């Protein structure tokens, strides 16, 4: 395949297209009347669409926003797979979740790389006071 757009060069984009192909095969045998069928189809489609749109944005804030939406869609797909297993529509979803784990990890990397504008807080000890603090 000849690369025509910058987002097509991203490994995470290619992996998300691979996941869509995996989902298409999976959904072939699942009743279209199940809401989770449509939800998984839409959420899986949302991943590469948001990666492509985010990669085309000019500001880091915009790029991160779309990459974060794509990450959320990947997590939504993982939950859809759990629902399909719970409803005994599929026996297991390990191979799909492995693809999703790679997608999420790559998106987190992209978000961290482009999020120079974000303020990162160190974890705080909420609700407890250190001995002698403020006494």
Predicted regions and their residues:
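Short, C-terminally biased terminal segments at protein or domain edges
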Residues: 1-135
């Amino acid at each position: 395949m000849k690369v025509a757009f910058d987002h097509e060069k991203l490994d995470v984009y290619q992996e998300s297209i691979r996941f869509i192909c995996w989902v298409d095969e999976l959904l072939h045998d699942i009743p279209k009347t199940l809401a989770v069928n449509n939800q998984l189809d839409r959420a899986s489609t949302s991943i590469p669409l948001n990666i492509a749109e985010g990669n085309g944005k000019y500001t880091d804030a915009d790029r991160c926003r779309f990459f974060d939406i794509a990450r959320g869609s990947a997590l939504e797909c993982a939950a859809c797979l759990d629902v399909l297993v719970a409803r005994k529509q599929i026996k297991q979803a390990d191979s799909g979740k492995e693809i999703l784990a790679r997608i999420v990890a790559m998106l987190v990397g992209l978000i961290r790389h482009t999020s120079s504008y974000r303020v990162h807080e160190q974890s705080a000890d909420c609700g407890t006071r250190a001995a002698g603090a403020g006494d």
